[in-house]
Amino acid sequence: MSKWILMPDSFKGTMSSLEICQLMREALLRHVPDAEVVSIPVADGGEGSVEAFLAAMGGHRVEVPCTGPDFRKISGFYGLLADGYTAVIEMAAAAGLPLMEGRLCAEGATTYGVGELILAAIRDGARRIILGLGGSATNYGGCGCAAALGVRFLDGTGAEYVPVGGTLDRLCRIDMSHRSPLLNGVEIVTMCDVDNPLCGPNGASAVFGPQKGADPDMVTRLDRNLRHLSEVIRQDLGREIADLPGAGAAGGMGAGVMAFLGSRLQMGIETVLDTVGFDALLPGATAVLTGEGRIDCQSLRGKVVIGIAHRARQTRIPVVAVVGDVAPGAEDAYQEGVTAIVSTNRRAVPWEVARQSARADLCAALEDLFRLYNAFRSAR
């Protein structure tokens, strides 16, 4: 009996990792009916991460009333894994762009609901929180999340307030003395796949602000306010966070979770591999089948395919990447431990056209892959 580990990322804009896992499983079992299949849909911290972790690890989804990014009450959620002490939270579930319903306001959106979800998960028994950054509507260092967890933000008169992106310039002092004691002893791991600093031309405001509705003047104000926040953090908390890799993720939420929650930032794929116990699954495996929508030079920077290849390389287990688009620089993946790259593109067409047949093209590529596997197996 052969053993296959299926660990695809989503094909952005076409198929989720859950869908791809299912298609891989169906194709594999058609050609290798007695195969042992380990399906692990990959989460990257953005939308769909809770469902992916629950599918891989078991557990259940918990619905929680919380504050949305525009301060209206919404129904948020998190996933409590089967171990009973690990919770997965998507920042986007309480502070995501879609929740703004087209009314983008980078200077006025809040992450308060994210803090409420963290508290709810801890009260539910979680001692380890996996927080996914991605799809955020906010741009102010996650101060609202911290405020929901008891961190106090004070203006020049000593009055407490909950900052947003447009009011960070009023901030004079940060008081951590009332931070919720429920956080004590809780490990918070933040999934972060970008290395942007907090401020400057590569910072949160300049790179991500426009997609949240910020025009050039607003980008300048937001960047100035985030720099001010970093100075107050340095003054009151003794932390230098402005230039840390990932500080600018999700509108500066990366900086906020490090400064206010003591969280560590970790590449999303490393979080997934550690949580599912990937290294322990490898012994006896025939191959690992992974994939993503596009493989290029950016894929070498800790993305899903390369993260898996690095782990599997130690055991010399083949890693096959099924991808939508093979771009220049993809061949460097072979030096990182990828055994083969299989493209689903059967004809040269623009992405807008290719996405319409993405499912059929993936199925065709998988059909060829497993036919080839059976041919080699029969020839031995």
Language-model segments: which ranges?
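N-terminal loops that bind phosphate or other acidic moieties
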Residues: 2-133, 137-380
